[in-house]
Each structure stands twice: as structure tokens, then as C-alpha cells.
């Protein structure tokens, strides 16, 4: 079943709102315009932190649906755990939902079910292969973000590759998990160095996947023998008297 931990969700929102984590929130907000350049569509589904929802809203959308918590419903069949029809959304945005969802791969499969043939899927989350992932075992597991599920870029790419998606955008930021006030003035310089020497090892990842469309190619029939059209025998012709 698709379930989220309500406590983890709320604590992550509080974490982003803390003044000490301003730089991480800014990193995410700065990435949103870059992500939006790679997505376009009419029917958008937003799954994740409500803190960043309005950044993805647009008057061009015919529909915009946002959900934060994911739970199973008695009215939803076992094969359809999100209350949406197949092929119903062409833009899907996932902000940290993989991090606080108990079964992230099941969520990915559900996203694929409701995605149209030309859909784009955007994801933001915590990168397992980073300094954040390295220090996570040493941190307090009862506070955010250390009690969340971190995922590697490789695993996420493989999940979507198996389902038939191509990666159209990839980036990471927030190289250092803890930023003392004495270092805050150097954050921009550290970010530049991280882009050059450790582009895949930032604590936050930003990914966009496009669903592959497999066009139907018409096949020309080749006849090995000549196709003969025989005339009707005269006796079979209807004569008007």
C-alpha cells in the first residue's frame, strides 16, 4: 500500500522553515525555474511539500491537483492506489515525497500509471551519495531530515529507465549538510566548486524524466508474386434490358 508518514512530512516542512536552513530552501527555490523549463503540459499533479506548491502553479494549466499525504483508500482498487485514472496527467512534480513515503518504488509505479505517453516527471529529494548520506548514520535519527529515506541518483534513474523514461535534466546542490554562520558568506563559492568537482554529490538532487513515446511505424507489404485482377466473365454481368 502507498502510505506516507504524516509526522515525517510535517517535520520536514518545519525543517525548511528554520532560519538555519535558509540556504537549503533557497537552493530548492533557485532550481524550480530551471526545472520548469523542462516541463510543459495541461494537467499537473503535484505530490510533496506544500511549501513549494505555488511555485509550480500556472494559469496555463487546465488542471492543477496537489496532494501531500498518500494513503490507501477503500474506494480504490488494489491495482490503482492513487485516485486518478490511467494516462490522466502530463506533468507530475514530486517534492521529497520519495523521502517520506514508506514504499517509494510503489509510488514511482503509480506515477507511471497515471502519466500520459508524453508526460514529464520532476523529482526533488535527498541524495544518498553525498556528504549528507555519509554523515546520516552519525546523526540523530529522531529529527529531520535524518529519519528520512535518502536515495541515490543511480537508483532513481534505474527505476525510471525500467519503466521507459529518459532523463532530460539532472543537477544537485547543497554540498555541505550543516552550514555554520561563519561559513554562510562562502556558500556561493562552495556551490561553484561543487558544480565543477562534485556535480553529482550535492545533498539535494533535481531530476526530470520524460516518458518515451514509441511511434507506430507503418510496414510496407511486399508481394512476391504479381497481383492479377481478372475481369468478370460476360455471362455474370447484369444486363439492363
How does the language model describe each region?
Residues 190-241:
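C-terminal lobe and adjacent flexible extensions of AdoMet/dcAdoMet transferase-like proteins
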Residues 1-37:
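Class I SAM-dependent methyltransferase Rossmann-like catalytic core
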Residues 120-147:
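Conserved class I S-adenosyl-L-methionine
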Residues 30, 34-82:
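Class I SAM-dependent methyltransferase SAM/SAH-binding core
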Residues 105-120:
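A short glycine-rich, Lys/Arg-flanked "PGG" loop and its adjoining helix->strand segment in the class I
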Residues 167-192, 200-202:
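Conserved catalytic loop of SAM-dependent methyltransferase domains
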Residues 147-170:
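Short alpha-helix
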Residues 80-92:
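A short acidic, Gly/Pro-enriched loop at the edge of an enzyme's catalytic core
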Amino acid at each position: 500500500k502507498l502510505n506516507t508518514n504524516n509526522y515525517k512530512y510535517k517535520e520536514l516542512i518545519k525543517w525548511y522553515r528554520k532560519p538555519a536552513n535558509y540556504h537549503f530552501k533557497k537552493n530548492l527555490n533557485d532550481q524550480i525555474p530551471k526545472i520548469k523549463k523542462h516541463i510543459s503540459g495541461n494537467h499537473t499533479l503535484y505530490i510533496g511539500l506544500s511549501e513549494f506548491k505555488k511555485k509550480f502553479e500556472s494559469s496555463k494549466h487546465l488542471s492543477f491537483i496537489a496532494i501531500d499525504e498518500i494513503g490507501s483508500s477503500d474506494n480504490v482498487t488494489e491495482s490503482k492506489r492513487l485516485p486518478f485514472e490511467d494516462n490522466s496527467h502530463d506533468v507530475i512534480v514530486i517534492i521529497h515525497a520519495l523521502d517520506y513515503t514508506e514504499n517509494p518504488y510503489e509510488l514511482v509505479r503509480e506515477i507511471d500509471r497515471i502519466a500520459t505517453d508524453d508526460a514529464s516527471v520532476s523529482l526533488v529529494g535527498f541524495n544518498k551519495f553525498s556528504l549528507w548520506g555519509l554523515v546520516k548514520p552519525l546523526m540523530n535519527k529522531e529529527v529531520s531530515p535524518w529519519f528520512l529515506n535518502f536515495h541515490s541518483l543511480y537508483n532513481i534513474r534505474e527505476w525510471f529507465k525500467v519503466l521507459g523514461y529518459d532523463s532530460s535534466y539532472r543537477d544537485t546542490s547543497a554540498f555541505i549538510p550543516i552550514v555554520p554562520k561563519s561559513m554562510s558568506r562562502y556558500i556561493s563559492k562552495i556551490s561553484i566548486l561543487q558544480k565543477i568537482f562534485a556535480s553529482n554529490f550535492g545533498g539535494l538532487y533535481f531530476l526530470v524524466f520524460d516518458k518515451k513515446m514509441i511511434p507506430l511505424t507503418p510496414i510496407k507489404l511486399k508481394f512476391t508474386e504479381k497481383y492479377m485482377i481478372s475481369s468478370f466473365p460476360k455471362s455474370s454481368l447484369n444486363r439492363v434490358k
